[in-house]
């Protein structure tokens, strides 16, 4: 994107980048916090101790926090768009794998992968910063930051899905939604 002048980009293109990136971040944040809801049932199903449960819930948060450094570097090197899509697809894969994790160790490993979705924050910032000049970056990034509402999405919708279909369905639906949004993001955004 460095080869073109940012001032020549249409406002519509900027708004499209902002809205799709914010929606993608919302979905990633929803996935990142999935254990806050399904974790209680997993604890019961697997007979986890309080310590094991705490570690399970904290694992994706730790991964998402630590991976941001690398994802930020890669977003600078390769562009935010391909890295964001890779984060969404890999997070979707690990979220889907949750339904097959039948041991605590497998659940922890998939939780590590689910945590990649937490790194989407820095990728979106790197991507959107290139679309807006300095005078408009604060507003754009503030709107993007509203994607944290994904945690509320999980806390509001996941219990209904869990009651109706079980915690496995939550993982499946969140994974499918992430794949669909990754494709939409890729098709309708530009580098």
What are the roles of these predicted feature ranges?
Residues 16-50, 71:
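Extracytoplasmic
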Residues 33, 61-69, 119, 151-153:
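Residue-level signature of mid-helix packing/kink "hotspots" within the transmembrane helices
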Residues 42-43, 74-75, 160-165:
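Interfacial helix-cap and linker-helix signal at transmembrane-aqueous boundaries
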Residues 55-64, 147:
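Transmembrane alpha-helical segments of major facilitator superfamily
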Residues 66-105:
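Conserved MFS/SLC helix-loop-helix module at the cytosolic interface between two early adjacent transmembrane helices
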Residues 94-98, 110, 114, 185:
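MFS-fold secondary transporters
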Residues 110-147:
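Cytoplasmic helix-loop-helix junction between adjacent transmembrane helices
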Residues 143-191:
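Helix-loop-helix hairpin linking two adjacent transmembrane segments in secondary transporters
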């Amino acid at each position: 994107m460095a080869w073109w002048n940012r001032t020549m980009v249409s406002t519509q293109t900027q708004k499209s980048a902002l809205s799709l990136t914010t929606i993608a971040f919302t979905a990633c944040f929803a996935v990142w916090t999935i254990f806050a809801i399904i974790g209680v049932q997993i604890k019961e199903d697997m007979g986890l101790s309080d310590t094991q449960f705490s570690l399970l819930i904290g694992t994706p948060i730790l991964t998402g926090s630590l991976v941001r450094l690398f994802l930020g570097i890669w977003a600078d090197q390769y562009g935010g768009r391909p890295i964001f899509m890779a984060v969404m697809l890999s997070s979707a894969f690990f979220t889907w794998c949750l339904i097959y994790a039948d041991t605590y160790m497998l659940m922890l490993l998939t939780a590590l992968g689910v945590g990649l979705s937490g790194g989407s924050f820095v990728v979106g910032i790197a991507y959107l910063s290139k679309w807006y000049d300095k005078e408009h970056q604060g507003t754009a990034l503030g709107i993007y930051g509203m994607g944290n509402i994904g945690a509320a999405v999980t806390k509001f919708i996941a219990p209904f899905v869990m009651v109706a279909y079980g915690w496995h369905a939550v993982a499946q639906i969140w994974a499918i939604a992430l794949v669909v949004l990754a494709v939409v993001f890729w098709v309708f955004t530009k580098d």
